[in-house]
Amino acid sequence: MSIRTLDGRTFAEMILAGAQNLSQNASAVDALNVFPVPDGDTGTNMNLSMTSGAREVEQMDTDDIGKVGSALSKGLLMGARGNSGVILSQLFRGFSKNIETKKEINALEFAAALQAGVDMAYKAVMKPVEGTILTVAKDAAKKAMILAEKETDITALMTAVTEEAEASLNRTPELLPVLKEVGVVDSGGKGLLCVYEGFLASLKGETVPQKAVLPSLDDMVSAEHHKSAQSMMNTEDIEFGFCTEVMVRLDQTKREFDEGTFRQDLSQFGDSLLVIADESLAKVHIHAEEPGNVLNYAQHYGELIKIKIENMREQHTSIISQESKPADNETPPAKQPYGIVTVAMGEGIADLFKSIGASVVIEGGQTMNPSTEDIVDAVKSVNADTVFILPNNSNIIMAANQAASVVDEQVFVIPAKTVPQGMSALLAFNPDQEAEANEANMLSAIQQVKSGQVTFSVRDTHIDGKDIKKGDFMGILNGTIIGTSENQLSAAKMLLSEMIGEDDEIVTILYGEDASQEEAEQLEAFLSEKYEEIEVEIHNGKQPLYSYIVSAE
């Protein structure tokens, strides 16, 4: 179908098709993540980000492409999750800004908008890396600019853009050695290609295949957490204290999935069980006393791609407290000079952050990146003139920076990439000092700590010069896999032996749901025997998937 001009309605249809196609392929994009850890989430993050943009567009009823573009940009900005989601939002922010005054655009203007998006995205990334989504977007836009000098058909232009995006994606391993080593193309670039393929299908009048959408667990379990119902019971009456939700990407080669057996086996761990499944995914909601048992069982069937655990006793106490307050308007708490927003996964880690001064802890991290809007809401809830944000994950830093750019408060993003870095930064904070001095001290603190993790591999791969088998426990030091073992305790010993230097004085061990206090104490005994001068601190972090998070400083 030949299209000479693009109006708002046609562009809106393209956006919805692009979002749908990305959703269809999110699992395939996740599978391209370089690290074989159980939290590969590029596809998930891009899907959630694009879906947020598409929802804003769905609310529009206009032929004005500038207004549709602005809606897309707004939705993407606030819904962006992870570095890939933020870059996607910046690509379409630049695109939308370029067309914001136009009611419709031609092929040349469409190409110029693609290029404006690339320019905006490159500016948003402090150190752009080629062989990523940025390269794919840049090459596709360059192709569009060249072709648009003669081509007036937007469908033909989009065809060329999509073909060049795919060719550029296939070249990414030549630009980024780690992709070549692992044998994959860039996951973010693949996600962008999925969006472009959806755009093209829409322009051609083709329908993007729709898969059945699993019902929302939030909708299905809302009655379980209704505040009025909770206010009628006593906290001590809650037998199973942790609301546990997990999404499993089913792997039939791992264990054949039978929903009845799956449901029956899970029922032994708690009550209020709900299981929703299709051919590729299973969603679980259960109230359990030991959430780790649920996660361990679910892992037998495939990769855990989303986890949420909430302490219902703590929530219930909070609800009772809130509902017992007078209904009349009370004076809000006085505004504070400083506030600290941090991100953490695991009840124990969250409690640690609160105990050393965090104002708000956003639930999230390795397995669930918070959106820009989540971080914005947290900053506003602090009610402080100046807020420090500790992302504690390299994949959350860009969303934190994006949140900082849209709030009125003075915000400092301390680029902590790990939980230990975040804790060191928070301990360096002094409320009696000026904001800039605190920023300097916190930035210095994150440079002084070495961070390590122990988790398991979700697939066979070759990375960092090592052959890794599915199920192996990996020791990861400052982002590099240093070795593997068949059991998590041995992996932790290997990791700490590599990590600890002669100048280190304190080792902190945060053991997760897959480890135990007894095992952590064995690790402590190992360290005490090998390093007599080292002080060892052990905490139950209760984090999922990562058996140990450790630090040395």
UniProtKB/Swiss-Prot annotation:
GO terms for biological process: glycerol metabolic process. One of its GO terms (molecular function) is glycerone kinase activity. Disruption phenotype: No visible growth phenotype. The gene is yloV. Residues 9-201 form the DhaL domain. InterPro entries: DegV_domain_contain (IPR050270), DhaL_dom (IPR004007), DhaL_dom_sf (IPR036117), FakA-like_C (IPR033470), FakA-like_M (IPR048394), YloV-like (IPR019986). PROSITE patterns: DHAL. PANTHER family: DEGV DOMAIN-CONTAINING PROTEIN DR_1986-RELATED (PTHR33434), PHOSPHATASE PROTEIN (PTHR33434:SF4). This is Protein YloV.
